[in-house]
Regions:
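Short helix N-cap motif at coil->helix boundaries in the Bergerat
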Residues: 86, 181-189, 203
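Histidine phosphotransfer helical core of two-component systems
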Residues: 3, 8-61, 67, 77-81, ...
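Short beta-strand-loop-beta element adjacent to the nucleotide/active-site pocket used for signaling
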Residues: 150-173
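Conserved glycine-/histidine-rich ATP-lid loop and adjacent helix of the Bergerat-fold HATPase_c
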Residues: 210-220
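Short alpha-helical Gxxx[C/S/T] motif in the catalytic ATP-binding
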Residues: 187, 207-212
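A conserved beta-strand-to-alpha-helix junction within the catalytic ATP-binding
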Residues: 46-53, 80-95, 113
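Acidic ATP/Mg2+-coordinating residue in the GHKL
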Residues: 177
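A short beta-strand-to-loop motif within the catalytic HATPase_c
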Residues: 148, 198, 225-229
Length: 241
């Protein structure tokens, strides 16, 4: 994992260093052009510097996101288990995720469905950590349905659902979407740190890895995925009660 972290942080740092060096050279050119009285040429070069600074900012934020993700990884096993209403937690994070995405993209729209087993009652979990997992899975589900909608599938209605069910001495949580599904070629990689199918800057590839650790190591549970290409994906969490 350490090698992976180093590699992931090195990439954006290389960009930061390269664009910084180029910008310094461009500033020297600007000084020369101003000295010659060529203000128009100087302004053109200045625009290149501005673009470089935007790229430096972008890659700096990328490195920052990786570091924050790794700090979450290191904290994932901490916390105190307490009796928690899992149905209320799932419902809360479903709506939280939807409204956060809607705030960023006013055109976003999706149907939300819930099916909660009221016989579950409270279960002993670390609510902040479990909430983080549920939120991550729901965020991914909304992302998946939005991507499918943007691809222009006729008559498509983006839908994300979350359900709970008591099975013997376990509680099962399902987060499902009717997005594009996950290719079998990458299915065995999705829980690996830094693996992501999202464009650069949109995901660190740490969400599912962190979720896996929280459920398996932090709670002694299981997390698995069922998917059908073109039809959608369901993540299934099983927690001991």
């Amino acid at each position: 994992l350490t090698a992976g972290i180093a590699h992931e942080i090195q990439n954006p740092l290389n960009f930061v260093n390269n664009f910084s060096e180029v910008s310094k050279e461009l500033l020297d050119e600007i000084k020369e052009e101003i000295g010659k009285g060529n203000m128009e040429d100087a302004m053109e070069i200045m625009n290149d510097v501005i673009q470089n600074l935007e790229k430096i900012n972008h890659h700096g934020k990328r490195a920052d996101a990786i570091v924050k993700g790794m700090l979450q990884h290191s904290r994932s096993s901490s916390g105190i288990k307490e009796p928690t209403d899992i149905n209320a937690l799932c419902d809360e994070y479903l709506r939280l995720s939807y409204h956060e995405i809607k705030e960023k993209d006013k055109s976003f729209n999706a149907t939300m469905k819930t099916d909660f087993d009221t016989s579950i009652g409270n279960i002993n979990i670390i609510p902040q950590d479990t909430g983080r997992v549920v939120l991550n899975l729901i965020n991914n589900a909304f992302y998946a349905v939005d991507e499918k909608k943007k691809s222009g599938v006729e008559g498509y209605e983006p839908t994300v659902s979350i359900s709970t069910k008591k099975i013997d001495n376990k509680v099962e949580i399902k987060v499902a979407d009717n997005g594009n599904g996950i290719s079998k070629k990458i299915l065995d990689k999705i829980f690996q740190p830094f693996f992501t199918t999202k464009p650069t800057g949109q995901g660190t590839g740490l969400g599912l890895s962190l979720s896996y650790d929280i459920i398996t190591k932090g709670h002694g549970g299981e997390i698995k995925v069922e998917t059908q290409l073109g039809e959608g994906t369901t993540f299934i969490i099983q927690l001991p009660t």
